[in-house]
């Protein structure tokens, strides 16, 4: 049984992809475990619509009372504001789980000097582990590396005794809405798709798109490379998230690079629509992890590798691609990486 009462403390300003992932996962779990009860502050601007708000949202005062009685509180990082004060006022750190979706931003996560500064504790800006939350919260889930204190890490005393408080890898996952247009028996009619909102950070986005376009033109593949935009705050292209989900559902091979961190929602949108994926080196888990060991994932370290993988996957589309053959692995991916996993 999963008869827990869970309060989700959302960011104070704007929405957050990571928080959306948590809310979607809880709503999916509730379908399987009706005894599960979760609530969040109704002012949070999630993308799930009015019915979701009516079912799970609470006015601020009511949410405070719910949180007092909750078994678990999930405190979500917010780029523009994290509500640490809410937990402090309740004096509820002993039942608070911190989910850290922070990222360094732009393409700075590629910089080895900055990586070293994070390990040494010199860098304390956006994207660095929150040492205070490590000490206060029984569990700390984190979207981006590092997941441990490193060679300079402090030890913290907990109810379990003296031990090094590590962080649990918790990347974004496959949300239920990503698969809204996917139909298992429907034939896909787009060979390659490379859709990005902006192409400056990292520039790999621009170059992989251009290489994909040239490759498809040369080899007669159907290609989609229109830019996407995110509503309601940022507009950079003609395709909204809703439209992009429809495109992924029609796509055989998706192109992915890192975003403002190693992780990106695009990676999970592509996998969620039963596509093959050519992805920049996946660095979400520890080096010996097999969490993403799937045949459909073709990785590249540089543009030379990317071109090689384009040729390899293109040949597979010509001679060996059968959509039905992907279904068994697709179900395993959903089992391990959907938001309810």
What is each of the regions a protein language model found here?
Residues 2-268, 272, 276-294, 339-340:
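Nucleotide-sugar donor-binding catalytic core of glycosyltransferases
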Residues 21, 25, 211, 308-312, ...:
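Alpha-helical elements of Rossmann-like donor-binding domains used by nucleotide-donor carbohydrate transfer enzymes
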Residues 93, 300-303, 336:
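Conserved aromatic
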Residues 250, 312-315, 335:
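Residues within well-ordered alpha-helical secondary structure of globular protein domains
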Residues 293-301:
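A short acidic/histidine/glycine-rich donor-binding loop in glycosyltransferase catalytic cores
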Residues 301-321:
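C-terminal "capping" alpha-helix adjacent to the active site of nucleotide-linked donor transferases
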Residues 317-341:
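A charged, aromatic-enriched C-terminal amphipathic alpha-helix characteristic of glycosyltransferases
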